[in-house]
Structures are given as structure tokens and as C-alpha cells.
Amino acid sequence: MAVLDVSYGERAKVHASPVARRLFELMEKKQSNLCASIDVSSTDELLKLVEKLGPVICLVKTHIDTIDDFSYDGTILPLVELSKKYNFMIFEDRKFADIGNTVKNQYKNGIFKIAQWADITNAHGVTGEGIVKGLKEAALETTLEPRGLLMLAELSSKGSLAYGEYTNKTVEIAKSDKDFVIGFIAQHDMGGREEGFDWIIMTPGVGLDDKGDKLGQQYRTVDQVIDSGSDIIIVGRGLFGKGRDPVLQGERYRKAGWDAYLKRIGQL
């Protein structure tokens, strides 16, 4: 049986990564494969949206460096408390892209101290395997909590250079650490099962209403994304942009994502 036909719960039982196991388990429990991408500029906006969306998401994706009034105690600690209250995980969309020693410092140090609080982060493969090693070292030196890394294999923006040979090389880098690299930001299934990998695929550019924006973002429907092999849909402006009600839209996208998943595994 292909992994695309297997439930999240079954995948959780045998996955090598404790981060992936926990994520699959809470997805099954909450019946949600929705990641809320909350790109805002204030702590108040961030926490208010997370409070509204927390009950229906499995993951919140942040760009923490866009928060004008950021402070660790004022921004991160309340966010972590909300993640415990509503049982979701935190993904800092940092997109690391430097040599190993540099990303190690960026991940563990500075004002953001990402390794201390983000369950998951991500990186480009452009600098090679050293980026994985550097980030893993930072995680191990910072916390006893398990951490996971996503590699950026494909992007949803028009004109992206992340395709073809670049994507293939990124997959090879991901194979260098089965425990720490848990999957990809990608537009479709990335394979690997014949070699014992069960990668989580998270896909941005998902919209039920909009087709794109003036800056090159291109949207696909929930069904298209899940049918292509994605495990988690990443939705941002579709949840709260253009005056939308995040509570209503959150449930709408949660149900759409979960129904598409149930169809894929033959349970709907």
C-alpha cells in the first residue's frame, strides 16, 4: 500500500521522527491538516488570530521577523501557551539559506532564538548538506524538545527556480538525516518510500476563492493539492485577508482539507 493511501494515524506509529509522530497524532485527533500562515506585523494581531484559529489547525506558520513589537516574553511565551491550549505545533518559516555554521547561529541565537520554541523550521538546499548538520547541531545544543526540518523543494510563486535538478538535489540533501528532516515544502509528493522515507509534504498557495495575487502567488484548490500528495495545506490570506472571518474560514478550510484527505485514503 502506498503511503498516500495510509492514514496519518498509521504513519505516526512507524515514523522515525518524534516531531512527525506528534504532528500526525494531533492531526488525527483534531481531524485537521490545516496550517495557518499568519503574516502580520504586531504581536496583538498574531495572538488574536491564533486564538481564533487554534481550535481548527494542526500547525501555525510564523514569520517572526515581521513582528514590529517582538519580544520573547511578550510574543513567544503567549504563542507557546496557545499551542498547548489548542494542541497545535509551531512552524517558523525562516527559510535558512547559508553555510552550516552561520545557520547554526541564526537558529539558536539572536533576539528570536528560534530553536527554543519552533517545533519545525525550514531551509533551502542551495548550500548543501551542511545546512542540515548546522541546524541539527543548534537544536541539540538548545533544547531537549525534538525539532524537525522541512526542505524547500518547490515553491508556489510564478517564475520560481525551485524545480527540476534543483528539486532533485534538495531531495538528496533531505536523505542525509532521516530523523531531523521530516519532509518538504512542495507542490506534490516527493517519493522516497522505496528507500524507507515517509516525508511530510506541506503545500502553500492553497485557496478556495482566489486564483493568485499581483506579486506572483498562484493558488490551487484543496482537492488539487491533497490529490497531488500533500499532507498539510498552508493557508494565509484565505483565512483572514480581505475582511474574512477567521473562525468561519478556518472551519471551512479544515473541513475541505480533511474531506480531501479522507477521499484520498478511501474513507469518504
UniProtKB/Swiss-Prot annotation:
PROSITE patterns reported in the protein's UniProt record: OMPDECASE
Residues of the active site: 95
CDD domains cross-referenced by the UniProt entry: OMP_decarboxylase_like
GO molecular function: orotate phosphoribosyltransferase activity; orotidine-5'-phosphate decarboxylase activity
Binding residue positions for substrate: 39, 61-63, 93-102, 219, 237
Record-linked SUPFAM superfamilies: Ribulose-phoshate binding barrel
Known EC number: 4.1.1.23
Similarity comment text for this entry: Belongs to the OMP decarboxylase family.
Protein's UniProt name: Orotidine 5'-phosphate decarboxylase
Record organism: Pachysolen tannophilus
Protein encoded by which gene: URA3
